[in-house]
Structure formats: structure tokens, C-alpha cells
Amino acid sequence: MIPEFAIREWSEHVPWTESEQVEQDLLICRALTEIYKDEYLASHLAFRGGTALHKLFLSPQPRYSEDIDLVQINAEPIKETYDHIRDALAFLGEPKVKQKKHNNTLIFRLESESIPVVPIHLKVEINCKEHFSVLPMQRMPFSVVNKWYNGKCDVLTYQLDELVGTKLRALYQRRKGRDLYDLYKALTTSDINIDNVLACYQKYMEFVAVSYTHLRAHETSAHL
């Protein structure tokens, strides 16, 4: 999909040594730009997760991150959002869609231009449950400059303290070394307000606890 000369050019801007990682990174950056160039998506989805942390706040990017994590701002049907994402990311082909009650994922599958050819997956995951932010959201400029693609947008995202707070919560939800690494890099290389981080962490943990309580109550009533 991407000419080899464009991949070589992009390798000058990212620290990855494998050609397929450079290629996937460029695809991710274009995908992010196309999503937030769409007026509907730009007002309905917020960018969160490790890729948001690394692409918007930590420079140079310290860790390879291959997913785009988004949060649905308002509680509403997801179909129109799906349609807009499909249109915005048509250059990636048709995605496989995995739907869950509170989480929806579009998976795009491609093959690398590098030899030997390896599969490249780009996952766009939408959280359809946490329709809130603790701190005011913000828009941050993002751009891609490459012979294959040029584009820019304003990405709706969370403040750094809130992103770090959700990373802290992730440590209690899963056992992923990348969460601990992301916390370490953010705390040692950025200007972090620890009080804000802990306040955000507490709010998200309270939300998880309330959601779990409601789930258990629903399961109990279903068996009565």
C-alpha cells in the first residue's frame, strides 16, 4: 500500500528498526488524522490509551503502540459512528467488526510492503461505556508530513493527568507490563500533577465499582 520510499522517509521520524513497524506507524498516523478530519467523528469520539499518550504527549515516542483507542463521548447508537469510520478509513479496506455490550472494535488487516511480507493489523477500539471525563477535554494539533500522505487535524483527547490516571487504573484491571512502563515514562519525563492523577484514578475506579455492582444486581435478579 505504501511505497517503499515513503516508508524509508517515515523511518527518519520514528525510532522503530523493523520496516513493518514503520509502515504500521505511518498507517496509524494517517488513520488518526482521517478520523479527526471527519467533523462528526471529531465531535463524538475522544482519543485515549497508550497510543494517545505516546503520539501526543511523550516525545520522542518511547514505546511502540499499534492500536487506536477511542471513547464515545455521549451515550448513543454506534451505527453512524461506524459508518463514518468506515468512510474515513476506506483506504485500509473493509474491517472486521467485533461488537460487545460496552466495547466495539474494528480490525483492519493488511500485508506489509516489506520483504518478507508480514501481516499488519490496525485495531480501532471504541469504549461505549465511559461517557465522561474528570478534567476538561482538550483539542491538540496533530499532523502527518510524508510523500505518501500529508494531513493535519485537531484531536479531541484527555489531559495528560487523566490519561495517566487511567493507566494507573489499568494496572488493577490487567497484567500488562506496558502499563507500568507508560506510567514510568510519563512520571519521569512530563510535568505531572499527582493530585490530579490520583483524583482521576479514584473517579475511574469508582465508576468500575458502580458498574460491577449494577452488573451483579442484574445477574442476581435474572436468576430469581
Features from the language model and the residues they span:
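Cytosolic catalytic cores of cyclic-nucleotide second-messenger enzymes
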Residues: L224
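Glycine-rich beta-strand-to-loop/alpha-helix junction loops that act as flexible
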Residues: F47-A52
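Structured mid-to-C-terminal alpha-helical surface segments
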Residues: M1-L45, L56-R63, I68, Q72-R216, ...
